[in-house]
């Protein structure tokens, strides 16, 4: 793991010591080199001692999420260049440093061996994310969004710390590799369901569960492009990863406690998809669609079958890349017309035909057609939920229908129709942007052709 963590940390002195005109090129190239060298981690042989240490370990669950995190760093740097082009050199280097610190804390979260270390790094990700939102956001409302993000996350997470300390005293260890063997001895000791709630709620807020999701649209809308990308692609997946890890401990209790959360997720999935139909703001629409997709992941994790876990992992990876790509496309529109309102971006297909192709591909993948990895994830989850209860097919089917409707609505509103007057003298699409979209699409294409890479 140090082969990944140390080179990532060394990007910070690289950013500060590089000459001003080379800072973006050097950091992007070196971070891309790190992401390429980390791909060998996907090969997980049975004798996996190379990826084990007392502090860090990798398995088939954490590796895909870890590689997604590392892959996204150069993409965030490529996407942010235009946003910071008018800023001072100090601002640019501070921004890059904040992103790299966030990256390191995310890598350590996904690789943590101990639940306490996982909790500490889980909370550490909050600080750089909030700095990115409140310092480099566009509107004044970013301060409000930052405080929402901070308080929702902290209020959800603090009971988890107390519970983990209690479990540590009861079991004597919080090592993730020991938990399956230790958990059997504590079933009779847990007479209350509050422990289950405190353990799960921190991750439910991060997912977010419908009803606890109000921080997400605010944070997405006010964050700069790198903030939106990392929020959608990775920070939401921290909640899913934490739930997958901690349900090993809570196994017998989950089957008694999951009904309200399953109902809320099924209802919230349809509701947030319906909210998307009423959105005029591009970033807000993509943010609400993230809540809808993550509700599917919550359902999968609660049902606790091998198929549902595979579906949850596939959908998390697929959604991470798809939503990040959609945010990049929304940002490319915003940089040209200086508005996130969809109706003001109408008719861009005639002005930016290549960008319209990226919009079409991203919209299609968001709708999960065959043979994409999105469809594989959704099919696994829908099949599992149908075997749990036949009635779930109605909200699931309705969600698929509404998802198609709002995605097509977003696509046609921004690309078709008569071009608005202020959009006629816009800049053409840059090679930087086309490279960015290609780097989002390549992993999706690879995973669609061979899902066994992560499943």
From Swiss-Prot:
It is a multi-pass membrane protein. The chain crosses the membrane at residues 21-43, 60-80, 99-119, 147-167, 195-215, 224-244, 257-277, 284-303, 308-330, 351-371, 375-395. GO terms for molecular function: NADH dehydrogenase (ubiquinone) activity; ubiquinone binding. GO terms for biological process: electron transport coupled proton transport; mitochondrial electron transport, NADH to ubiquinone; mitochondrial respiratory chain complex I assembly. It holds the Pfam family Proton_antipo_M. Its main location: mitochondrion. Its EC number is 7.1.1.2. It catalyses: a ubiquinone + NADH + 5 H(+)(in) = a ubiquinol + NAD(+) + 4 H(+)(out). Core subunit of respiratory chain NADH dehydrogenase (Complex I) which is composed of 45 different subunits. Core subunit of the mitochondrial membrane respiratory chain NADH dehydrogenase (Complex I) which catalyzes electron transfer from NADH through the respiratory chain, using ubiquinone as an electron acceptor. Essential for the catalytic activity and assembly of complex I. PANTHER family: NADH-UBIQUINONE OXIDOREDUCTASE CHAIN 4. Belongs to the complex I subunit 4 family. This is NADH-ubiquinone oxidoreductase chain 4. It comes from Mammuthus primigenius (Siberian woolly mammoth).
């Amino acid at each position: 793991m140090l082969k990944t963590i140390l080179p990532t940390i060394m990007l910070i002195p690289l950013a500060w010591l590089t000459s001003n005109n080379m800072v973006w090129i050097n950091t992007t190239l070196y971070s891309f080199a790190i992401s390429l060298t980390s791909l060998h981690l996907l090969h997980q042989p049975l004798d996996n001692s190379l990826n084990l240490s007392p502090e860090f370990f990798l398995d088939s669950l954490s590796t895909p999420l870890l590689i997604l995190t590392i892959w996204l760093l150069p993409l965030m740097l490529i996407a942010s260049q235009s946003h910071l082009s008018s800023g001072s050199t100090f601002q640019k280097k501070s921004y890059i440093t904040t992103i790299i610190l966030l990256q390191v804390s995310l890598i350590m979260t996904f690789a943590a061996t101990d639940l306490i270390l996982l909790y500490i790094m889980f909370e550490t990700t909050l600080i750089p994310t909030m700095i990115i939102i409140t310092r480099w956001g566009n509107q004044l409302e970013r301060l409000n969004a930052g405080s929402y993000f901070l308080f929702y996350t902290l209020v959800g997470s603090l009971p988890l710390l107390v519970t983990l300390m209690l479990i540590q005293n009861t079991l004597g260890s919080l090592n993730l590799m020991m938990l399956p063997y230790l958990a059997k001895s504590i079933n009779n000791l847990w007479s209350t369901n509050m422990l289950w709630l405190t353990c799960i709620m921190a991750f439910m807020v991060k997912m977010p569960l419908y009803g606890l999701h109000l921080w997400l649209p605010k944070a997405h809308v006010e964050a700069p492009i790198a903030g939106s990308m990392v929020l959608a692609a990775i920070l939401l997946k921290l909640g899913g990863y934490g739930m997958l890890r901690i349900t090993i401990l809570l196994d017998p209790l989950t089957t008694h406690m999951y009904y309200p959360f399953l109902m809320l997720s099924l209802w919230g999935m349809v509701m947030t998809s319906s909210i998307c139909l009423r959105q005029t703001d591009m970033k807000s629409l993509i943010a609400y669609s993230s809540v809808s997709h993550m509700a599917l992941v919550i359902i999968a994790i609660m049902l606790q079958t091998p198929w549902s876990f595979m579906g949850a992992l596939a959908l998390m990876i697929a959604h991470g890349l798809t939503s990040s790509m959609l945010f990049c496309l929304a940002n490319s529109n915003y940089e040209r017309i200086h508005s996130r309102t969809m109706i003001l971006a109408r008719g861009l297909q005639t002005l930016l035909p290549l960008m319209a192709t990226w919009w079409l591909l991203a919209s299609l993948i968001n709708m999960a057609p065959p043979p994409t990895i999105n469809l594989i994830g959704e099919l696994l989850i829908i099949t599992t939920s149908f075997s749990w209860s036949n009635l779930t097919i109605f909200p699931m089917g309705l969600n698929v229908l509404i998802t198609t409707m709002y995605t097509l609505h977003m696509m046609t509103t921004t690309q078709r129709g008569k071009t608005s007057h202020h959009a006629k003298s816009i800049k053409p699409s840059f090679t930087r942007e086309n490279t960015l979209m290609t780097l989002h699409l390549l992993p999706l294409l690879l995973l669609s052709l061979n899902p066994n890479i992560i499943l």
